[in-house]
């Protein structure tokens, strides 16, 4: 029973909005019971411990999520000195002189998906990631969720291509601030 609960919980976390479906890594916590909307802050200590958990699951999903989380840590939190920064903020500023908005870097609308991917891949991505016109977050935006990882090799290749293209598009958005404080204990969890 405990293994079933672990498998179900880790699958729900990895498929929900708490997990960054494009860039890897986990948000600090979810603000709803369905794990759709995260508090978008990404902490080193959470990701270090979750990386270890997913790596020990011994499943294809665990291996994928552990690898993507490790990539996130190395790409987003590694400092020039070789340690890891403490966190990425939940907020980023959209317009010059504007105010910080939670989740702005991470959320999408169907229109944005079509603009980045074209009509076919945009519609496919909206369906695959649960992005709706009503939105799952604020102002008609949605967090990306991947409740069912494709099993068909063609769909897996399409998903990889869509994720790569959306990640590249997201990199053009205003980024959340990074807390460059290097905490030895948190770094110890990550290495």
Predicted regions span which residues?
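Glycan-recognition and catalytic cores of secretory/periplasmic carbohydrate-active enzymes
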Residues: 1-191
């Amino acid at each position: 029973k405990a293994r079933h609960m672990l498998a179900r919980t880790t699958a729900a976390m990895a498929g929900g909005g708490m997990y960054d479906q494009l860039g890897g890594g986990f948000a600090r916590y979810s603000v709803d019971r369905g794990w759709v909307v995260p508090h978008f802050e990404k902490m080193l200590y959470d990701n270090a411990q979750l990386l270890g958990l997913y790596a020990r699951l011994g499943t294809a999903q665990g291996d994928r999520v552990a690898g993507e989380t490790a990539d996130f840590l190395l790409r987003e939190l590694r400092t020039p000195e070789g340690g890891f920064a403490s966190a990425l903020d939940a907020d980023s500023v959209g317009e010059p002189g504007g105010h910080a908005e939670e989740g702005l870097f991470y959320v999408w609308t169907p229109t944005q998906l079509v603009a980045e991917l074209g009509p076919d891949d945009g519609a496919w991505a909206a369906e695959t990631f649960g992005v709706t016109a009503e939105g799952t977050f604020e102002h008609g935006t949605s967090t990306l969720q991947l409740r069912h990882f494709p099993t068909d090799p063609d769909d897996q290749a399409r998903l990889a291509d869509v994720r790569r293209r959306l990640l590249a598009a997201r990199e053009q958005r205003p980024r959340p601030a990074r807390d460059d404080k290097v905490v030895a204990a948190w770094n110890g969890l990550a290495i």
